[in-house]
UniProtKB/Swiss-Prot annotation:
It comes from the Bacteria. The gene is atpB. HAMAP family: ATP_synth_B_arch. This is V-type ATP synthase beta chain. Keywords: ATP synthesis, Hydrogen ion transport, Ion transport, Transport. It holds the Pfam family ATP-synt_VA_C. Produces ATP from ADP in the presence of a proton gradient across the membrane. The V-type beta chain is a regulatory subunit. Belongs to the ATPase alpha/beta chains family. It comes from Clostridioides difficile (strain 630). Disulfide bonds: none annotated. GO terms for biological process: proton motive force-driven plasma membrane ATP synthesis. One of its GO terms (molecular function) is proton-transporting ATP synthase activity, rotational mechanism.
Length: 457
């Protein structure tokens, strides 16, 4: 039996205090019935004796303390799953917003899920092709990996996100592939861009999209990534699909967490974020991976904008501790019209060595990757020297490297947001660029690969 309480003590912003409650649990959902019959939803943040602190999903305007009633539903926030969720667009709270019919769920799953038991994890080892050379060739994404994209305000991370969602595929397997895309705290314009691009390119057919707008409540923003991960877990571990989860923007998520924490008057941590920000992010990121005995997998690409392009800001800093690398977008490359502006030198995929090589990409992948990194790094150094001392101060070989760095950015990194390159095309472009340098400089490439793959003049 569901009890109703008319003992609302206080309302402060999005928070409400209720006295005299019994059997109420943390994270439990509730309904507030206003005097005019309107229903608003809430969830329990804290229980102390017979007093419950709840947070409203909607505005607290119009709540009359004496006449409003509260009832608790005995369950936490959940999402109804079935194979029909593919091809659909949902709100941040899991309601269809694409004009289609309601989903008839096979079951309802708690959105908080559970991180994968470390003993049950399988090591990521299979290549995922994104069609983006700077990722596939140099910072390879591996199935089951967590690889964030660190962007800055005004950089085209939204375009890169939809490009990866549209192009990503698992090669050489009959396994089904799906994308779960969660847009957190975005504008109407961005929401329209994401949804129209998914529909125009047909990517929507293999995708589940969750959209939380900037004017939606902060508590909904905190729930949206977990809705997406619940859908991903169902598709991966019950439907045996390989799922790529893209969440943009984690910064908006953390801001919402800070807002909720401030409303609860919690002691703030670094820069006002709650002290449990690291733990909270880990409960999301660690839901990605592969499990022994399961065909499916969850690969995650969280995207975040670094405030003031600061890599030491708590959000990118803590994200870097939990995830397996990072892809960094560069404002300098963006100004040169390099699209996507991925700065490959500070970028890193810690699991890339496990997903490349013979039988996965190609036997020469590791050698060309190492040589391209080394040559581009030296080319950047040569260009810095040229800017200080002038071109005449450089040796002939340094001039070659400086030219290589320019061509590398134009030909390899820059490909636009509509070009889908196979790994073979990416490797061929790499070999073509390396042919600009004399063989004596290519010390990281084995002779047999040089003879086999170097383009003949």
């Amino acid at each position: 039996m569901i009890k109703e309480y008319k003992s609302i003590q206080e309302v402060a912003g999005p928070l409400m205090l209720i006295n005299g409650v019994e059997g109420v649990k943390f994270d439990e959902l509730g309904e507030i019935e206003l005097s005019n019959g309107e229903i608003r939803r809430c969830k329990v943040l804290e229980v102390n004796g017979d007093t419950a602190l709840v947070q409203l999903f909607e505005s607290s305007t119009g709540i009359n303390l004496a006449e409003s009633k509260v009832r608790f539903l005995g369950k936490s926030l959940d999402f109804g799953v079935s194979p029909d969720i593919l091809g659909r667009v949902f709100s941040g709270m899991g309601r269809p917003i694409d004009g289609g019919p309601e989903i008839i769920p096979d079951k309802r799953l708690d959105i908080n899920g559970a991180p994968i038991n470390p003993a049950a994890r399988d090591y990521p080892a299979e290549f995922i092709q994104t069609g983006v050379s700077a990722i596939d060739g140099l910072n390879t994404l591996v199935r089951g990996q967590k690889l964030p994209i660190f962007s800055g305000s005004g950089l085209p991370h939204a375009n890169l996100a939809v490009q990866i969602a549209r192009q990503a595929k698992v090669r050489g397997t009959d396994s089904k592939f799906a994308v779960v895309f969660a847009a957190v705290g975005i504008t109407f314009e961005d929401a329209e861009f994401f949804i129209s691009d998914f529909k125009a390119t047909g990517a929507i057919d293999r995708s589940v999209v969750f959209v939380n707008l900037a004017n939606d409540p902060a508590v909904e923003r905190v729930s949206t990534p977990r809705m997406a991960l619940t859908a991903a877990e169902y598709l991966a571990f019950e439907q045996d699909m390989h799922v790529l989860v893209i969440i943009t923007d984690i910064t908006n998520y953390a801001e919402a967490l800070r807002e909720v924490s401030a409303a609860k008057k919690e002691v703030p941590g670094r820069r006002g974020y709650p002290g449990y920000l690291y733990t909270d992010l880990a409960t999301m990121y660690e839901r990605a991976g592969k499990m022994k005995g399961h065909e499916g997998s969850i690969t995650m690409i969280p995207i975040l904008t670094m405030p003031e392009d600061d890599k030491t800001h708590p959000i990118p800093d803590l994200t870097g501790y939990i995830t397996e690398g990072q892809i960094i977008l560069s404002r300098e490359l963006y100004k040169k019209d390099i699209q996507p502006p991925i700065d490959v030198l500070p970028s890193l995929s810690r699991l890339k060595d496990k997903g490349i090589g013979k039988g996965k990409t190609r036997e020469d992948h590791a050698d060309t990757m190492n040589q391209l990194f080394a040559a581009y790094s030296r080319g950047k150094d040569a260009k810095e020297l040229m800017a200080i001392l002038g071109e005449s101060a450089l040796s002939e070989i340094d001039l070659m490297y400086a030219k290589f760095a320019d061509e590398f950015e134009k030909e390899y990194v820059s490909q636009g947001f509509r070009t889908d390159r196979t790994i073979e095309q990416t490797l061929e472009i790499g070999w073509k660029l390396l042919s600009m340098l004399p063989k004596s400089e290519l010390k990281r490439i084995r002779d047999e690969y040089f003879e086999k793959y170097m383009p003949k003049e």
